[in-house]
Amino acid sequence: MASYEIFITFGIYLVFLMAIGVYFYSKTTTHESYVLGDRGVGYWVTAMSAQASDMSGWLLLGLPGAVYTSGLTEIWVVIGLALGTYLNWKFVAPALRVQTEKYNSLTVPSFISQKLNDKKGYIRTFSAIVILFFFTIYSASGLVASGKLFDSLLGIDYKWGVLIGGGTIIVYTFLGGYLATCWTDFFQGCLMFFAIIVVPVAAYYSGGGIDGISTAMEAKDISLNIFKYTKVWSLPIIISGLGWGLGYFGQPHIIVRFMSIDSADELWKSRLIAMIWVFISLLGAIAVGITGIGVFTDISQMGGDAEKVFIFLIHKLFNPWMAGILFAAILSAIMSTISSQLLVSSNTLTEDFYKHIVKREKTHKEMIWVGRLCVIVIFIIASVLAMNPSSKVLELVSYAWAGFGGVFSPVILFTLYKKDLHWKTVLVSMIIATITVITWKTSGLSNTLYEMVPAFVINSISIYLLEKFKVFGNNEK
């Protein structure tokens, strides 16, 4: 059972997040403000909220655990994510900000549909279905992580942990909408950044410095040479790892941040901040795993679970008050991603379904409350999926990333930069990519090559060939 200091720290943290939602409740007066913050978010908040909603619990739990177990075998994923982050900010962010405002688009599906002149809304509908499916699963996986965190840290029953963590998210997302989500992500991103620096520094000295850590690594036969285990047949592993970066261009909960910044001219500042955050955070996560080897020479000291190395280092090295703050950073990593996914899903239901199904004129107040109700509905569905602590839903996180990356990434790039792209070309290519992701995963081929890579390639080739040979003719404007 955790000490009262940790309970108090967690309580203050959760109340603080809900207070942000209450604060922005009165500032959310229009549908666009609830969905996109009236496109008035500053560059600091844009950068930090995008990165906080991106990394999730993998940054503080998954990556350090992988490094603790097998050294730098995950380095290709890290490199892929860093490159993908930069390219996303460099090539997608400015164009998406300008063009979504031009077409008055509040969601990714509506932008693609409007720019390509899809008058029937087929692309919008198909895109919305894909987003709702994968984000409901994605959100459920975050709630599973939340429940397990409350259970392992505070001794709170798993199901109550799901409801407490999710309930807090619901309060500030329901009340404050997009602005509340961005600002909570901003503070959570700062807390994550603080933790990822402080913990490995303390662990370095506790583990005996370079000599102590090196000795422990040699005893476990772990090397920092990224090519030690790289053979000719490792090429698919390298491609799969680097391929994670391709997914960034199509992640709705990340690229929506580009759409809401107050000026496209400020995006270079956001890019600089984001890249510094990502670079240091990824290095810090790797350092947690490496220094953890020096502190815990045997995995049994952590209950046999390498992914808890960050948690056990905090328990061992810090007093309860500081531990509570650092544990809150782990919860931040989980909550920042869930809130963004819930809001994007809600906006998809509201903007891409309700708005077009209900033909009569709708007020801003009505659209805001429909959005709030959608947040609750999606949360309930995700919570039901997450109620089983042994749920396999966590395994679907990479599946969801592949779904968005394979289906949306090429489409976003072509839509932004290809002139006279036919909407039928895009719709057919999206369907082909979706089938590719599902088939590749269910056939077991993903054990050899990450399913997003073939989906991305096939999607891109499909768009190129269909347009080159004008299969659907010229797009009507």
Name each model feature, range by range.
Residues 1-477:
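Membrane-embedded helix-loop-helix hairpins and adjacent transmembrane boundary segments
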